[in-house]
Amino acid sequence: MAAESTRNSSPPSTSQSSSPIINLPDDHLLTILLLLPVDSILSFSMTCKRYKSLACSDSLWEALCEREWGPTSVDALKLSSLRDGFSWMLMFQRVYKMDSVCCHKISDPDDDDEESSSFPIPRASHSLNFVNDHLVLFGGGCQGGRHLDDTWTSYVDKSNQSILKWKKVKSGTPSGRFGHTCIVIGEYLLLFGGINDRGERLNDTWIGQVFCHEGLSWKLLNVGSLQRPRPPPRGAHSACCIAEKKMVVHGGIGLNGVRLGDTWILELSEDFSSGTWHMVESPQLPPPRSGHTLTCIRENQVVLFGGRGLGYDVLDDVWILDIQEPCEEKWIQIFYDFQDVPEYASLPRVGHSATLVLGGRILIYGGEDSYRHRKDDFWVLDVKTIPSSGLKPQGLSLNGSSVWKKLDRISYGPKSRSFHRACADCSGRFLYVFGGMVDGLLQPAASSGLRFDGELFMVELVLGFSDLDHQQRPGKSM
């Protein structure tokens, strides 16, 4: 019966004799399809009924989603109710066509019905991470220019991600600071640098681990003697993880307020008890800056975007740190043609967030421009258009409209902000945002109003309007 079915759905015998692929069993064909781009798979599906059935199979598209988004996102989606009744092929289409976000307010100490003692005080330039199903918040700067040294955690229940309770933990924390970086590597947090309220720049490295019942333990990481290479003290730099046990640090504000343009990589030991720094040597280097972002997009590539440069100008350039071999790193600039992007003028920013989300794209939110006007917009940078290898030192030119997309926002709109912090959950579909600088009431003799914010809200990637049964896009009907 199987042989007869194959004959019925295959081209005539003359074609069979000239195309060996027709005689391949289905499991071999599926293996080949997994090596092809999605467009090629869709073209393959249009050749005959048998190939259409193969190319539309749920097992193939589940594997494609895992290939494109990573196994962590796919595993998280399997546990959620989002996929109920939907195939993986439809899920892929929804993520690919995603063009809007929905913001959900979770907590705000300014609300009359909230007890302020149960929340972290308003702050900016802190750190916020998602690790082991917990949000972890540390440090930052607050009213009066004071630094903070507190650590807060909140368990995120997969069944109800919009109800969270903060808990202040005693953890033997690092000294107070703001403008530091804190990244997730496996089940660990890695914190570096920052500035204290005496204006001192720091270059210490701490490693933290979250335990059950929201416990957290910090310890100073051993990076060798003072004679060993290490980054100079700094704050307002950027950092991200790369590979399995490496942290990349770039730029920031160093001693005497000088903006830096150097790049360093910290490689952790197998047991996470120590690390070794080395400085990246590259023919091309991004200009010095602070308040920018680094986002890991692949095991061997990091994206740098924006920040404030030497002349206090706010930047919109994009660079790729390409690591094809250990200690063979190179920076490559990505050039865009923005003629077809009318809203491009709003892209330059500093103090924004840039987070890798579901679909393998970078979600950029907020920040401020050269005039310190804070933003509330969401942009997506589609890094799938950037090759994973073969990048040339002279850079790469791409069509801006195929790479950048401004997203619509549905329902609740958070205040415009800068120097907030954001992190995504395991699925990459939900983004948590806390704090930052927001516009406040204009004070007497002040040129502008400015205040620290203590709001926590969740940003949801909208995968089709059916996700929001009772909400509508402004100006459009469901």
Curated annotation (Swiss-Prot):
Boundaries of every F-box domain copy: 18-64
One Pfam family here: F-box-like
Region named Disordered: 1-20
Gene3D superfamilies: 1.20.1280.50, Kelch-type beta propeller (2.120.10.80)
SUPFAM superfamilies to which the protein is assigned, alphabetical: F-box domain (SSF81383), Kelch motif (SSF117281)
Low complexity composition-biased segments: 9-20
Name used for this protein in its record: F-box/kelch-repeat protein At1g51550
Organism: Arabidopsis thaliana
Organism phylogeny: Eukaryota, Viridiplantae, Streptophyta, Embryophyta, Tracheophyta
